[in-house]
């Protein structure tokens, strides 16, 4: 069974919690589908080429059909001409959206949490608030745990905690309503407030 490391007020290991056993039984393909969909949604879709209907000019036949000894041509804007259109090029009208239903999103998050717990990289504490709002104090939390980078999940994200963490390149802090399987997977460690963890497991 996957274990969640429980931290005390001094961020020292104080015990362990069990994740629901069904989390580890989730098919990892659900996690793959969600991550693929999430990354696809981030694509900017800026590459664009002009097709035959987009380029200007080329309405006049450049030379007569027969009698010149050369290849026939009906326009100077086909894809074989310099200054002509592009055949099968990328357009900014392409839609990269990939549908993932609510159940798959939920299963993906469960599997991502189970994977982190199996590696001993899922932590929980009563409070993760940084009341001072200082980056120095937020950095001390990460150093204390000895992790390379971390996702911080709060039950209710307050402004001071956000200010404290947002200037750290190796940290990302989110409200529990915004946490997803991709964020859990991409960080080496995940630290969740106990109340936030309860709300996640309750939904499942």
Swiss-Prot record:
Domain of life of the source: Bacteria
Residues covered by region (Disordered): 49-75
GO biological-process terms attached to the record: translation
UniProt xrefs under InterPro entries: Ribosomal_uL4, Ribosomal_uL4-like, Ribosomal_uL4_dom_sf
Keyword Cell division part of the UniProt annotation: no
Gene3D superfamilies: 3.40.1370.10
Gene Ontology cellular-component annotations: ribonucleoprotein complex; ribosome
Keywords recorded for this protein, A-Z: Ribonucleoprotein, Ribosomal protein, RNA-binding, rRNA-binding
GO terms of molecular function: rRNA binding; structural constituent of ribosome
Keyword RNA-binding attached: yes
Function: One of the primary rRNA binding proteins, this protein initially binds near the 5'-end of the 23S rRNA. It is important during the early stages of 50S assembly. It makes multiple contacts with different domains of the 23S rRNA in the assembled 50S subunit and ribosome.
Similarity section: Belongs to the universal ribosomal protein uL4 family.
UniProt subunit comment: Part of the 50S ribosomal subunit.
Protein name: Large ribosomal subunit protein uL4
């Amino acid at each position: 069974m996957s274990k969640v490391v429980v931290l005390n007020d001094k961020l020292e290991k104080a015990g362990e919690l069990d994740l629901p056993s069904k989390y580890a039984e989730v098919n990892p393909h659900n996690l793959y589908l969600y991550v693929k969909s999430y990354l696809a949604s981030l694509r900017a879709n800026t590459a664009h080429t002009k097709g035959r209907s987009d380029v200007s000019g080329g309405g006049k036949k450049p030379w007569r059909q027969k009698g010149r000894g050369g290849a026939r041509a009906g326009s100077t804007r086909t894809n074989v001409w310099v200054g002509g259109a592009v055949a099968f090029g990328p357009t900014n009208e392409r839609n990269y959206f990939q549908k993932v239903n609510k159940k798959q999103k939920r299963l993906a998050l469960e599997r991502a949490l189970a994977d982190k717990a199996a590696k001993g990289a899922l932590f929980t504490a009563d409070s993760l608030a940084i009341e001072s709002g200082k980056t120095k104090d937020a950095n001390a939390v990460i150093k204390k745990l000895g992790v390379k980078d971390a996702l911080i999940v709060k039950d209710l994200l307050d402004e001071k905690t956000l200010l404290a963490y947002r200037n750290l390149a190796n940290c990302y802090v989110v409200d529990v309503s915004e946490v997803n399987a991709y964020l859990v997977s991409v960080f080496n460690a995940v630290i969740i407030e106990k109340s936030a963890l309860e709300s996640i497991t309750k939904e499942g």
